[in-house]
């Protein structure tokens, strides 16, 4: 166990030192370039139980088209992100993919709809968002059950429901051309804790991540919902955290 923890700490240090430089930064939005045309957007969500939480999303651009994975939590920061994409990448945003029904995934969805960007999620996310009478989130427009392929500049984007984990509706999104997996909150950053378990299925979580690992064996860069992105060790770390 001590050896495993030492390996995790060493890996965290290596990944932290290898993180690409931030190419855009304001008090509300940070953007890292992780491959040519692939970016992590990092924003902040104010929570009652956890304070100010850093949240990851992603952007992929190809041949003048782009897709966004998860919105910032607010309309204003979502507008800032959309503006940056249009100005910096000079691409047309063809889709926003929502990972699950929490605010760190769809809090700014109204802005995307307002400017004509179609949204996609699992059908479960549509149901949970539609039934949330407390927060009353905007509901994604298009839903799928198990898997959805989108085309961005002719390149495939695979959106996949691996099973329950952080929530009952969490999905992952894979970009084969750059071998980047946006795992969202079902994937934990190295060294992180279990996080928000209010709607989690902790008994299914490890098996769901095993499904991700098996489905996308070529994924090289893994982006969690919170914390530092890294390599496939994030999958193993999450499996061990929730494994029996």
Language-model-detected regions and their locations in the chain:
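Bacterial Sec-dependent N-terminal signal peptides
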Residues: 1-20
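Metallo-beta-lactamase
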Residues: 22, 26-29, 34, 65-67, 73-74, 123-238, ...
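Conserved beta-strand hairpin/beta-sheet module of binuclear metal-dependent hydrolase folds
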Residues: 35-82, 172-185
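Divalent metal-coordination and catalytic microenvironments
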Residues: 37, 60, 70, 85, ...
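Acidic/histidine-rich helix-loop elements
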Residues: 42-55, 131-132, 192-200
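Solvent-exposed loop/turn segments at secondary-structure junctions
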Residues: 45-48, 66, 73-76, 101-105, ...
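Active-site metal-binding motif and surrounding structural segment of the metallo-beta-lactamase
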Residues: 63-67, 76-120
């Amino acid at each position: 166990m001590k050896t495993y923890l030492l390996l995790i700490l060493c890996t965290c240090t290596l990944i932290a030192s290898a993180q690409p430089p931030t190419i855009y930064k304001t008090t509300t939005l940070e953007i890292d370039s992780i491959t040519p045309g692939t970016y992590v957007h990092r924003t902040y969500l104010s929570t009652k139980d956890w304070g100010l939480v850093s949240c990851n999303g992603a952007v992929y651009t190809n041949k003048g088209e782009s897709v966004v994975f998860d919105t910032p939590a607010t309309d204003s920061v979502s507008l800032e992100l959309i503006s940056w994409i249009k100005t910096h990448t000079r691409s047309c945003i063809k889709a926003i993919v929502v990972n699950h029904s929490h605010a760190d995934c769809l809090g700014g969805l109204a802005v995307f709809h307002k400017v004509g960007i179609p949204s996609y999620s699992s059908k479960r996310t549509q149901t949970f968002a539609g039934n949330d009478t407390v927060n009353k989130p905007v509901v994604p427009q298009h839903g799928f059950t198990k898997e959805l392929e989108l085309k961005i500049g002719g390149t495939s984007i695979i959106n996949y429901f691996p099973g329950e984990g952080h929530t009952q509706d969490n999905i992952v999104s894979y970009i084969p051309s750059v071998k980047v997996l946006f795992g969202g909150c079902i994937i934990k950053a190295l060294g992180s804790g279990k996080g928000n378990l209010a709607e989690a299925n902790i008994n299914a979580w490890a098996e769901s991540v095993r499904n991700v690992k098996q489905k996308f064996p070529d994924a090289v860069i893994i982006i969690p919902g919170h914390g530092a992105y890294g390599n496939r060790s994030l999958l193993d770390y999450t499996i061990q955290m929730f494994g029996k």
